UniProtKB/Swiss-Prot annotation:
It catalyses: (4aS,6R)-4a-hydroxy-L-erythro-5,6,7,8-tetrahydrobiopterin = (6R)-L-erythro-6,7-dihydrobiopterin + H2O. This is Putative pterin-4-alpha-carbinolamine dehydratase. Keywords: Lyase. Its EC number is 4.2.1.96. It comes from the Bacteria. Belongs to the pterin-4-alpha-carbinolamine dehydratase family. It comes from Shewanella baltica (strain OS185).
């Protein structure tokens, strides 16, 4: 399978299918530092990135904002001193789509 970070997001409409349990099991193995959270009944991907200070955390946040705009898919971002919590899910389907896994992998690439 092509690396997730090399894929592009596809337009996701409200009737797009959520990932199946089988797809979830396969895709989550490709982004091992991410966890699955359920908030208000909505499955989401989440990872906490740690940094040495606020300035580095903010620089990462800004790079992530640029990436989100390029792909037109936007995460939840919580930036604080020394860490950034990133949450991906597809708002239109209230759950996880392959796009979320692609963006999680691309987010990890921002550290390289």
């Amino acid at each position: 399978m092509t690396a997730l970070s090399n894929m592009k997001c596809e337009a996701c409409q409200a009737d797009a299918p959520k990932v199946t349990d089988e797809e979830l099991a396969e895709l989550i193995r490709m982004i091992p530092d991410w966890g699955v959270q359920v908030r208000d009944g909505v499955m989401q991907l989440e990872r906490v990135y740690k940094f040495k200070n606020f300035k580095l955390a903010m620089a990462f946040t800004n790079k992530l904002a640029d990436l989100a705009e390029e792909e037109f898919h936007h995460p939840g971002i919580f930036t604080e001193w020394g860490k950034v919590t990133v949450t991906w899910w597809s708002h239109s389907i209230k759950g996880l789509h392959k796009n979320d896994f692609i963006m999680a992998a691309k987010t990890d690439q921002l550290l390289v």
